[in-house]
Design a protein with these regions (language model features):
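Short, threonine-centered small-residue motifs that mark membrane-proximal processing/anchoring sites
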Residues: 2-9, 13-15, 19-25, 193-220
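Hydrophobic alpha-helical segments, especially transmembrane helices
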Residues: 4, 128, 223-225
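Enrichment for repetitive, rod-forming helical segments
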Residues: 10, 134, 228-229
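Short, surface-exposed polybasic-aromatic patches that bind anionic ligands, especially phosphate groups
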Residues: 24-199
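C-terminal membrane-anchoring or membrane-association module
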Residues: 218-229
């Protein structure tokens, strides 16, 4: 089995078990590829807010499983690197309470564009695009107008804002059959930043391997329980 296949299967198994749990432990190690600063203005129907923050993806771990990159979908909460949080629950992104009803589907399309996201500029652009999709309700994605606006900071001078705009513009001609989109919802009060990420939809052969792995884990679990009895 190739290493490139092991990681998606391991993450899929982690997601399978997490989806059955009431609460999950989530850790954020760092920005995955650095970040860029940006100024944000949110307007009604969002709770109005103006802030300056860093945009980028997070190196994330769910219940001690393999790391992956997640993105913030909650500009009203905060998080800390290196601190495990136990107030999260994993849900399909379609179940998350987005302000924008089309957000879950459009975030899936953003992933399906398969743009390279391997630098601080690209990851900042991806995060800004996700924020725009999350909070924009005017009917058109435009970083400079509407209910979610983004400007300035190093995102403006580095080209991250321009890149985000181009990716948002491509959504209208993009379809998504390749990615399942998930949300990590913080259930605390106060909570922490809700997150979103995507996993590739497995090929049928990968499903078979996952099923075999889960079956083996179940058999070993039953044998261990029998020995303890």
């Amino acid at each position: 089995m190739s290493r490139s296949l092991i990681a998606p299967i391991a993450l899929a198994c982690t997601l399978s078990f997490a989806a059955q749990a009431r609460a999950d432990t989530v850790s954020f190690a760092r920005f995955a590829n650095g970040s860029q600063s940006v100024d944000i203005a949110l307007g009604s129907p969002n709770v109005p807010k103006n802030l300056s923050t860093q945009a980028g993806g997070f190196t994330t771990s769910l219940n001690g499983g393999p790391s992956f990159v997640s993105y913030c979908i909650d500009l009203y909460e905060y998080l800390l690197f290196g601190t495990p949080f136990t107030d999260y629950t994993l849900v399909p992104a379609a179940s998350h309470a987005f302000t924008n009803a089309a957000a879950a589907a459009d975030i899936g399309k953003l992933y399906a564009e398969n743009n390279p996201v391997n630098s601080s500029v690209a990851q900042a652009a991806f995060q800004i695009a996700i924020w725009e999709i999350t909070y924009e309700t005017s009917g058109a994605y435009n970083l400079g107008t509407g209910t979610a606006m983004f400007s300035g900071g190093t995102a403006g001078t580095s080209g991250a804002l321009t890149l985000a705009s181009s990716w948002l513009g491509a959504l209208a001609t993009t379809t998504n059959n390749a990615y399942a989109v998930w949300a990590l919802d913080s259930i605390g009060n106060p909570g922490h930043q809700d997150q979103v990420f995507a996993t590739p939809v497995p090929e049928p052969s990968t499903y078979a391997l996952m099923a075999a792995g889960l079956l083996c884990m179940g058999v070993f679990g039953r044998r261990r329980a029998a020995r303890q009895d």
